């Protein structure tokens, strides 16, 4: 009830202004009596994945807390893990505004943010300060002005800096809002990137006496053949997990709606079925060898369960959380 009232007010604002206000309030309320408005005590539902123990299988997807400013607040809401970022080596402003749009009737969101963030060094300081006993995933990307052929260098820079502080590292090569980025999902480009990341992972594991798993985040806009090729690269390079999926460019389910023609990636309920199909295809190829983190359109216990039955080991929410609030986390965790 409280969230529905708050949402009514937030939804009167521009989508990005509402997001920024929410982040600001979470920062302000953390550790004060006001965090009672969103703090939840949820049952323990531990899950083993990537050699880590997650308090429960419901995580916050990357993109909501890009700079790691509200990790404790999201932990208080009952998330079993929190993924922050996407972060890049250098700060960048992202794409021009407006760049975030609600498709309210479809419970969807279109964004073309463009990896706006304050840079990896800023994020690392926030992660170091966070008082959160759950798993923190750190999602890394490349700067917009880094040529795609040198993209691996940006991922390695970020990896070096976040490695000591991350529970796992998510490699984002699937955002549709950085020109050319999705080309890294294919063929030799993917193999070369994954090989470089695994080599650096081994070096950093020896240096820090700590093994931090790598998860690759992929797009939903892939053919079955392309997914199979990605799976071959994942297996060949012994990547620890795959996150399925990022946002979609497909607009078939929202055609004619306000903002449907805005450029960017679509998330939320319109992505629900397609992301589950991708998970099924991944599981067919990977089985239990490489765990899958399912994300895309989860807005209820039922849709979360569908992802788990399709083969996902963990799930993440973002758009569903925007529309439903912390109660969505409780609904899923309590019913598992």
From Swiss-Prot:
Annotated residues for binding of FMN: 62-66, 86, 139, 172, 217, 245, 268, 297, 318-319
Gene Ontology cellular component list: cytoplasm; plasma membrane
Cofactor(s) the protein needs: FMN
One Gene Ontology molecular-function label: dihydroorotate dehydrogenase (quinone) activity
Protein location: Cell membrane
Regions that span the bilayer: none
The keyword Signal is assigned to this record: no
Example GO biological process: 'de novo' pyrimidine nucleobase biosynthetic process
Swiss-Prot/TrEMBL keywords: Cell membrane, Flavoprotein, FMN, Membrane, Oxidoreductase, Pyrimidine biosynthesis
EC number: 1.3.5.2
Primary location class: membrane
Reactions mediated catalytically: (S)-dihydroorotate + a quinone = orotate + a quinol
Residues at which substrate binds: 66, 111-115, 172, 177, 246-247
Pathway membership: Pyrimidine metabolism; UMP biosynthesis via de novo pathway; orotate from (S)-dihydroorotate (quinone route): step 1/1
Top-level taxon in the UniProt lineage: Bacteria
Membrane-protein topology: Peripheral membrane protein
Cross-referenced InterPro entries: Aldolase_TIM, DHO_dehydrogenase, Dihydroorotate_DH_1_2, Dihydroorotate_DH_2, Dihydroorotate_DH_cat, Dihydroorotate_DH_CS
Active site: 175 (nucleophile)
UniProt remark on cofactor binding: Binds 1 FMN per subunit.
Protein family according to the UniProt entry: Belongs to the dihydroorotate dehydrogenase family. Type 2 subfamily.
Function: Catalyzes the conversion of dihydroorotate to orotate with quinone as electron acceptor.
Subunit structure: Monomer.
Protein name: Dihydroorotate dehydrogenase (quinone)
Gene source species: Vibrio cholerae serotype O1 (strain ATCC 39315 / El Tor Inaba N16961)
Gene name as annotated: pyrD
């Amino acid at each position: 009830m409280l969230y529905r009232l708050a949402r009514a007010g937030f939804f009167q604002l521009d989508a990005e202004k509402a997001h920024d206000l929410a982040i600001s309030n979470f920062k302000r309320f953390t550790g004060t009596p006001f965090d009672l408005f969103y703090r939840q005590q949820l049952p323990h539902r531990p899950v083993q994945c990537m050699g880590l123990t997650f308090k429960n299988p419901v995580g916050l997807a990357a993109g909501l807390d890009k700079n790691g400013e509200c990790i404790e607040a999201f932990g208080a809401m009952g998330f079993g893990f929190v993924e922050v970022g996407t972060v890049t080596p250098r700060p960048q402003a992202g794409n021009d505004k407006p760049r975030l749009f609600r498709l309210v009737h479809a419970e969807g969101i279109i964004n073309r943010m463009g990896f706006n963030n304050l840079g990896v060094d800023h994020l690392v300081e926030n992660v170091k300060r966070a008082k959160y006993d759950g798993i923190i995933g750190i999602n890394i990307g490349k700067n917009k002005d880094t040529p795609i052929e040198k993209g691996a260098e940006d991922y390695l820079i970020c990896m070096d800096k976040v490695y000591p502080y991350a529970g796992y590292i998510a490699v984002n090569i699937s955002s549709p809002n950085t020109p050319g980025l999705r080309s890294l999902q294919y063929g030799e480009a993917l193999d070369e990137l994954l090989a470089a990341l695994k080599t650096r992972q081994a070096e950093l594991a020896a240096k820090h006496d700590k093994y931090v798993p790598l998860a690759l985040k992929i797009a939903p806009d892939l053919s079955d053949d392309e997914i199979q090729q990605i799976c071959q690269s994942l297996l060949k390079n012994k990547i620890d997990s795959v996150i399925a999926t990022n946002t979609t460019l497909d607009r078939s389910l929202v055609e004619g709606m306000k903002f449907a023609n805005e450029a960017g990636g679509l998330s939320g309920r319109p992505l629900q079925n397609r992301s589950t199909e991708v998970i099924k295809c991944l599981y067919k190829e990977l089985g239990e060898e490489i765990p899958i983190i399912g994300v895309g359109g989860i807005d209820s216990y039922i849709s979360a369960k569908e992802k788990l039955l399709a083969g996902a080991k963990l799930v993440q929410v973002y758009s569903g959380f925007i529309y439903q609030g912390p109660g969505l986390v409780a609904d899923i965790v309590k019913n598992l």
